[in-house]
Regions:
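RNA-binding basic/glycine-rich loop and surface signature characteristic of RAMP-family CRISPR effectors
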Residues: 1-386
Length: 386
């Protein structure tokens, strides 16, 4: 079963403050609060937010390549064939004489002939059957086509059939959090977070007694925001260039390992808080009683999560109307080649006001590589048991 699911590590660097709001106003330190883990109270980027915006960016990536090559949906219906997939195949065959539609490229997956911008976001016509590809709502907007790589990879729901999708997103949790200190900016983390991300070195135990660990271990004391803590020793963490985002590289000497019990307190005390005010368009001055504050995950924060791709091509009994399914390689390419949109268009709220941009790094999980090597036959003994 493990061979059917491919996992990828996700490391994300916030290049702008990131605001994923909880909705509405609250009474407290700030008016607009951000999403937090209900157990640890540490801010995070929910997997639902990541999946939704990545779906949109995948659509943008595909349309940028096929916009002038894809047919109208009415042209597909004119093709011979009983099912929609047969009509698509016949249209592609008519185009392949000039190499217009190369299905080996993920941009030109068979079902992408029906892809529209509305395949991202909420379906406008969920009450229609999958075969009704020209259906529109009262505003004339189409819905999820149910045939393209995006619909099959991220999921869709129609009157006659629903599909879970093949890509599964975890939350992005904070791994390294930047804090100002007397020694400059340092990034705090915990042993538990290093374990979950696969970065924990051997010999590093949990810190206790409100002491922290640094690379040098000779600082005596260090301030993390308003907290003044004793340095209890050294850590042996070696990133070996694992946390690199183009020109940015996190160094071992920049990392401070703190007790799990203090991590939430330090993070929540050092979030970015931005004060905004509404402007009267007539006077050009601030409106009275229109001041509000918003908190955000600060620039420089590094987050960690994972994405699993579930290969359902080997399933028997999949309805014919769902075929063909994209393979894992095509879905992985789609994610990797569309993630650059996060660097320009961002994620979350207030992206037009200096928020939201992140850099994403995708890589295969180390344990999967080990498992692949473990399953390879041993050439020294003919592949038998040792």
């Amino acid at each position: 079963m493990s061979n059917m699911v491919k996992s990828n590590q996700v490391f994300a660097l916030a290049t702008d403050p990131v605001y994923i709001g909880t909705g509405g106003y609250t009474i407290g330190r700030v008016d607009n609060t951000i999403v937090r883990d209900p157990i640890t109270k540490v801010p995070k980027i929910p997997g639902s937010s990541l999946a939704g915006i990545w779906r949109y960016y995948t659509v943008l990536g595909i349309l940028s390549k096929i916009k002038d090559k894809k047919p109208k949906r009415e042209d597909i219906l004119k093709q011979t064939g009983g099912m929609i997939k047969d009509k698509i195949d016949n249209w592609i065959k008519s185009q392949n004489t000039n190499g217009k539609w190369d299905v080996s490229n993920w941009h030109f997956f068979e079902g992408n002939t029906l892809l529209e911008l509305n395949c991202a976001g909420q379906d406008n016509v969920p009450q229609e059957e999958l075969s009704n590809i020209t259906a529109t709502n009262k505003e004339g907007k189409t819905g999820h086509c149910g045939h393209c790589l995006v619909c099959k990879g991220f999921g869709f729901s129609k009157k006659d059939i629903s599909w879970q999708g093949m890509i599964f997103f975890s939350d992005l949790n904070i791994l390294f959090f930047p804090v100002f200190t007397m020694y400059g900016t340092k990034w705090i983390t915990t042993v538990r977070r290093l374990e979950v991300s696969g970065l924990k070195p051997n010999g590093v135990d949990n810190t206790t007694d409100n002491k922290v660990l640094t690379k040098n271990g000779n600082e005596g004391h260090i301030n993390l925001g308003w907290l003044y803590l004793e340095v209890g020793g050294t850590h042996s963490l070696s990133l070996n260039a694992k946390i690199v985002f183009e020109s940015f590289q996190l160094n071992d000497t920049d990392i401070v390992i703190v007790p799990e019990s203090l991590f939430s307190q330090i993070v929540n005390s050092n979030l970015e808080v931005r004060t905004s005010v509404s402007i009267d368009p007539i006077t050009g001055a601030a409106k009275e009683r229109a001041l509000f504050t918003s908190e955000a995950i600060p620039r420089g924060t590094i987050l960690y999560g994972n994405i699993r791709i579930f290969d359902k091509n080997s399933f028997t009994g999949i309805e014919g109307k769902l075929e063909p399914l994209p393979d894992v390689e095509k879905l992985e390419c789609a994610l990797k080649e569309s993630k650059h949109f996060f660097e320009t268009l961002g994620i979350g709220g207030m992206t037009t006001r200096g928020f939201g941009r992140i850099k994403i790094k995708l890589s295969e999980k180390p344990e999967e590589k080990k498992e692949e090597n473990k399953n390879k036959p041993d050439e020294t003994n003919g592949g038998g048991q040792q």
